């Protein structure tokens, strides 16, 4: 999806693609352009900005490698699977003078703009997300995979600091939480 979007932006050039699955990289390149890099090292030498859309458990190591090479990063959410890893990436980006942006795409959903126009000084917001089990992002639970969007939107709408959150999650289909509730 990232390659498709970049290919539609006039001011962006999709220069290179790297995927550990070379066939997937070839398919993306044939659809949207860009050179297929044979290694991550070759890829890093070709680009200025990188989209990281890998399993969350790899974000810190990949992010640190890219930031140490002074590459700007759009990293899929969540930024990391622990707050320590997230803070390490934020600190390194600042130290290197690089942009580190987390892909909270729901912030740019036109529906959110409509909600903002109608919602002035909210006192209570309740969000429910019901969906079939996605069979994706198996290295993290539903909170970091999907609920993070809902929490980010609520924080954006409320525009105040969090005082407290009460939450519970349970594993049902996997070893990580599949069902979660936060208040």
What is each of the regions a protein language model found here?
Residues 80-137:
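A contiguous active-site-proximal alpha/beta segment in oxidoreductase catalytic domains
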Residues 12, 48, 71, 96-99:
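Short, well-ordered coil/turn segments that N-cap beta-strands
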Residues 4, 26, 41, 64, ...:
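Active-site phosphate/pyrophosphate- and oxyanion-stabilizing loops and adjacent acidic/basic residues
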Residues 134-183:
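Rossmann-like dinucleotide-binding domain that binds NAD(P)(H)
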Residues 38-41, 129, 170:
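Conserved SAM/SAH-binding loop
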Residues 2, 32-90:
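Beta-loop-alpha module in the N-terminal Rossmann-like domain of NAD(P)-dependent dehydrogenases
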Residues 1-31, 154:
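N-terminal Rossmann-like dinucleotide-binding module
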Residues 15, 48, 123:
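Conserved acidic residues
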């Amino acid at each position: 999806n990232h390659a498709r979007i970049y290919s539609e932006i006039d001011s962006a050039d999709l220069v290179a693609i790297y995927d550990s699955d070379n066939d997937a990289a070839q398919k993306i390149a044939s659809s949207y352009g860009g050179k297929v890099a044979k290694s991550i090292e070759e890829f890093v030498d070709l680009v200025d900005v990188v989209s990281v859309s890998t399993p969350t458990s790899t974000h810190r190591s990949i992010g640190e490698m890219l930031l140490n090479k002074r590459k700007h990063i759009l990293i899929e959410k969540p930024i990391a699977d622990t707050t320590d890893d997230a803070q390490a990436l934020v600190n390194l980006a600042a130290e290197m003078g690089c942009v580190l942006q987390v892909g909270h795409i729901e912030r740019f959903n036109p529906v959110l703009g409509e909600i903002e126009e109608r919602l002035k000084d909210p006192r209570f917001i309740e969000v429910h997300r019901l969906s079939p089990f996605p069979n994706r992002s198996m290295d993290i639970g539903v909170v970091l995979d999907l609920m993070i969007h809902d929490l980010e939107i609520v924080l954006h709408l409320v525009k105040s600091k969090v005082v407290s959150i009460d939450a519970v999650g349970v594993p049902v289909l996997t070893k990580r939480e599949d069902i979660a509730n936060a208040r």
